[in-house]
Amino acid sequence: MKIEYLHASKYGNGAMVAREFSRQMADKGVTVDVRHIREARPKELPAADLYLFSSPARFGKPIRGMRRFLKKVELPAGTRYAILTTEAAAHPDTAGHVPSDKEMAKWTRVRPAMNEILQGKGLVEVAEGTVHVTEIKGPPEEGWQHKVETFAASIPIQD
């Protein structure tokens, strides 16, 4: 199985997650080609069994470069994809209140925005996940490798 992993890492967190995902999938005999979206042409993506798109969040949405990239992607309808994002972890407000997952979901729309673009092209999602970062520039939260491992386990492997 071959996975094409396209990320838009700004501060290196997404690239770190991509390397960990690639390592874990290699242990399962899966080939993962990792590249930054600046190194890829959205209308000329190499053939793969699965495309994995990864974006950091900016104001609760995928960064603009990833949104533009996804809008230009040309893949046949029915193509399988997955999403793995890097997003800010919940932090207490000035009153000390830490938002719940439900509250966070109201303003964090990275995966839904990416899905809307890709599903609008007839692509089929097979998995999605998030790795939280402690600050805007990172690093990832403690235990992030386990989150990547859990995500990798959710990818249906084809021979």
Go through each PLM region and give its residues:
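FMN-binding flavodoxin-like domain, especially the glycine-rich phosphate-binding loop
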Residues: M16, Q24-K28, D33, A47-D159
